[in-house]
Design a protein with these regions (language model features):
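Nucleotide/phosphate-binding sheet-loop regions of phosphoryl- and nucleotidyl-transfer enzymes
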Residues: 1-389, 397, 415, 422-425, ...
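Short alpha-helix capping/helix-loop boundary micro-motifs
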Residues: 311, 480-486
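Short beta->alpha connector loops at strand-helix junctions that form conserved
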Residues: 41, 448-450, 469-472, 560, ...
């Protein structure tokens, strides 16, 4: 006996999703537990894959099994497909393993033709109903299976309704419907070059093939790519005998959720229509009634429906989204599936389900997608406002949240207008460190260039600012203060709105929905913290971000970038003076001006942390990044420092590098200019001493960036220890501190055993490690990475999703060698991947001590770390069933 490609509903169960798809498996399960389900059968996902292997042909084996299942269905129903006496009608639905948009829509009433419509009219004693069903079928079949534009049919309907003064489809008479059927068949003949198929088996085969084809349509393929769903799964096809909600006042159809999908409240939520078919509810042609009113209209049906929905929720142990039809006073369940819900509802349902004894805490934790917490903790646009707004362009969703504001193209303009209370969007080709003040004051940031790890993206995430980056459809003219997009020109002061969670850019100002956390969220996150065994720190460069990270549950700072402290308006002149200094004496004078600023910064951060660890990265970027690039700013600097303009131009040119990311930066600056790191270490020591003397606990971890050789770290460790000791001795103070390094160069990974001899900890800088491991410049990779993903060379952009196969091997090598040389070595990650759930799971598997991410991603990282720990313990969702 060959493979089984077709299963009756009474032959399957809910754990056969891979074979029967979500829809087919759930219909089989509802049948098994005795619910009133119109019977039918499911053609498996394997039949879909077989169809593609046979170049778009349904094999004879599959056809034979369909015919056999159809015969059995006809016997059960006491009706025959295509009969002109008492015809069997069926619906055809796609049913992938995972629910996804883009798959083929439902076809209802399949089996109707010029003869069987008479049989339907006779058997139901309702001619109008029969022709209404026929016109619906022709339109659906033509649109969904044969891809004839829907508007061609809608135009006929609208014309007749307008001519006769009808308000609703229900006003159409039998004669009207007969005329519409005739016109619909003419449209089909004209579009397809042949008559509308009258053989029900031909109709069925065409519909099945259309479902299989829809598996590979562009929308479905893109959705699978975005959601990591395999192209090899295929879709099932569900064939189900029709029940009719449009047979009069004792019939109807509706959709309901067993809990409120927006809030999670444990009340039935849904709507229905009397005398209607399923698509009427979705199409919005008539206004549905709340499910609560069904209790008055049909009390017995309502009581039965309540009992069924409660049974389904207990059975599936999750909120269900159900479709139902009432035919002549009898209730039928057409579908159930786990309902989609907002982040707020997801957490409430998970917590309530634990309290109700439906699931365990572990399952509650595994049920919440970490990315949902991003949605919960950032403001979002009102969903209706988004639907009504004009979307101008789409870039990269670089930092989540929603922001509306007036467009300004220069940081100083943002600062000036923000002071007057205006909401401002900073719009740039790409941002640079000079824009930092404008970025702080802006409600959101929009750039035409740059990727998910560009300057704008990284800084925005750190500040919790909404950012859309790399929006290549924008033509930004910073000089003219205009941006051209989609045939429009936006001027300075015009309103735009950006959605950092989707990357969409909208015209005008959109209404927003703010989200606040409640006791349910607090309870859920307490379970998360109980479950995880890996620490979560935050990346923070100032006391404000440090406090924000702690408020979100961070257990310290995993990356404090000292260079970000240099860009404040009152200190950048001293930084530039230090960089442009002629010799050591001038450089030391400039550094003396910077020391008090850095000392105060560290003191303030240590106070906020009060005993929590603080990993401080010493100066990393190349010096030219701190210098101005626009002519006006260069002239102002020349006047400020008393330098001739020509001399200043020459000094700036001398500091320019062909490849600055691989140039004179990081520890290399300290080897050539040790006084820079000496000043920073003094500031750390003095800030720590002041905090200690005021009764605070201090735990500094000093981190040296860009180490590629153990000798570099040996030399700089000595410099740091000597400088620290001088300061501590002078103050007669003791302080426990550690010294470590960033692991961000491939050579450092493969010589980690040597480097570990001089390090108390390693922190993986995955941005640079990815950049150097692939040989990509992350600022230029946006030009080709999209194409790499589209063509299947990469599954994902490696700057967004950690590359476990390649960069992960370098990472694993460094972990193994480092711990071999020094078993007590602490390990962390502080690159942008520190907030990526897949990367966090990988870090857990490698035994890392902590992950560190931007403040707003801390809750996400806490949840991802808990999920990794639960899965590593061998727990699976099936244990709760």
């Amino acid at each position: 006996m060959g493979k089984t490609f077709v299963y009756r509903f009474d032959q399957g169960h809910k754990d056969m999703r891979d074979l029967l798809g979500g829809k087919g498996a759930n219909l089989a399960e509802m049948t098994a537990i005795g619910l009133p389900v119109p019977q039918g059968f499911t053609i498996t996902t394997e039949a879909c894959n077989d169809y593609y292997e046979k170049d778009g042909q349904v094999s004879s084996l599959v056809l034979d099994q369909i015919d056999q299942a159809l015969l059995e269905l006809e016997k059960v129903q006491g009706k025959v497909l295509g009969s002109d006496d008492n015809p069997l009608l069926v619906s055809v639905r796609s049913g992938a393993v995972f629910s996804m948009p883009g798959m083929m829509d439902t076809i209802l009433n399949l089996g109707l033709n010029d003869k069987s419509v008479l049989g339907l009219a006779s058997s139901t004693q309702n001619e109008r109903f029969a022709y209404d069903s026929y016109r619906r079928f022709i339109q659906m079949f033509s649109d969904v299976a044969m891809e004839i534009p829907k508007y061609k049919f809608e135009a006929v309907l609208d014309r007749i309704k307008e001519a006769k003064g009808y308000q609703s489809d229900t006003d159409l008479t039998t004669d009207d419907l007969m005329a519409i059927v005739a016109e619909y068949k003419s449209i089909y003949q004209s579009e397809m070059g042949k008559a509308f198929p009258q053989d029900p088996r031909e109709q069925l085969l065409l519909a099945i093939k259309a479902v299989f084809r829809s598996w590979n349509n562009p929308r479905a393929r893109i959705y699978r790519q975005l959601n990591d769903i395999s192209d090899q799964l295929g879709t099932a096809v569900t064939i189900q005998s029709m029940v009719f909600g449009n047979m009069g006042a004792d019939s109807g159809t509706g959709v309901a959720f067993t809990r409120n999908p927006a809030t999670g409240e444990a009340v039935l939520f849904g709507e229905y229509l009397i005398n209607a078919q399923g698509e009427d509810v979705v199409a919005g042609i008539r206004t549905p009634q709340s499910i609560a009113t069904l209790e008055k209209e049909m009390p017995a049906i309502y009581d039965e429906f309540i009992a069924i929905t409660q049974l389904l929720e207990k059975h599936y142990r999750d909120m269900q989204d159900v479709e139902f039809t009432i035919e002549k006073g009898k209730l039928y369940m057409l579908q159930t599936r786990n309902g989609k819900r907002t982040a707020k509802a997801a957490i409430k349902i998970a917590v309530d389900s634990v309290k109700e004894g439906l699931i365990s805490k572990e399952e509650a934790i595994l049920r919440i997608e970490p990315s949902q917490l991003d949605q919960l903790l950032h403001p979002t646009f009102d969903s209706k406002a988004c639907q009504e707004a004009l979307c101008l362009a789409k870039g990269l969703p670089a930092s989540p949240g929603a922001a509306s504001g007036r467009v300004y193209f220069h940081a100083e303009d943002v600062v000036a207008h923000a002071k007057q209370g205006e909401p401002c969007l900073l719009v740039r080709q790409e941002t640079s460190p000079e824009d930092i003040e404008g970025m702080v004051k802006a409600t959101g940031i929009l750039t035409a260039r740059g990727g998910m790890t560009s300057h704008a993206a990284v800084v925005a995430r750190g500040m919790g600012k909404t950012c859309v980056a790399g929006c290549s459809q924008l033509r930004v003219n910073e000089a003219a203060k205009t941006v051209d997009v989609d045939g429009r020109q936006i001027h300075e002061g015009d309103y735009l709105s950006i959605d950092g969670s989707t990357g969409r850019v909208y015209l005008g100002e959109l209404a927003m929905t703010s989200v606040t956390v409640d006791d349910t969220y607090t309870t859920f996150m307490s379970w998360v913290d109980e479950a995880r065994d890996m620490l979560v720190r935050t990346n923070a460069d100032n006391p404000r971000d440090a406090q924000k990270g702690i408020d979100f549950g961070a257990e310290g700072i995993g990356l404090c970038r000292t260079e970000h402290m240099f860009f404040e308006e009152d200190r950048i002149p001293a930084v530039r003076e230090m960089i442009l200094a002629d010799g050591l004496d001038d450089r030391l004078k400039a550094l003396d001006k910077l020391l008090p600023f850095q000392r105060q910064d560290f003191y303030e951060i240590f106070k906020v942390l009060n005993g929590r660890a603080c990993t401080i990265r010493l100066l990393d970027p190349p010096l030219h990044e701190f210098l101005p690039h626009e002519e006006k700013a260069i002239k102002d600097l020349a006047e400020q420092l008393g330098y001739p303009l020509d001399y200043l131009h020459k000094r700036i040119a001398d500091l320019e590098e062909f490849n600055p990311m691989l140039g004179h930066r990081g520890c290399r600056l300290a080897i050539t200019y040790p006084e820079i790191y000496q000043m920073q270490v003094k500031a750390i020591a003095q800030g720590a001493i002041k905090a200690l003397q005021e009764g605070y606990e201090v735990r500094p971890e000093i981190m040296v960036p860009l180490i590629s050789s153990a000798k570099e770290l040996a030399m700089l460790r000595l410099l740091i220890e000597q400088t620290m000791q001088e300061e501590l001795t002078a103050a007669d103070q003791e302080l426990a501190y550690t010294i470590g390094t960033m692991i961000e160069i491939p050579r450092a990974c493969v010589t980690a055993d040597d480097i570990a001899q001089y390090a108390d900890f390693f922190s993986f800088g995955t941005n640079d490690l990815t950049q150097m491991g692939f040989g990509f410049s992350r600022d230029d990779a946006g030009k080709f990475l999209g194409e790499y993903v589209d063509r299947g060379i990469f599954d994902k952009d490696p700057f967004q999703t950690f590359d476990q196969k390649g960069i992960g091997r370098l990472f694993s090598t460094a972990v193994a060698l480092g711990r071999l040389a020094k078993p007590e070595l602490k390990l962390g990650i502080c690159g942008e991947h520190g907030g990526d759930p897949a990367a966090i799971a990988f870090c857990h598997s490698q035994g890392l001590t902590y992950v560190s991410c931007s403040p707003f991603r801390v809750p996400l990282a806490r949840l991802a770390a808990a999920q990794a720990a639960i899965k590593a313990s061998g727990y699976s969702l099936t244990q709760d069933k």
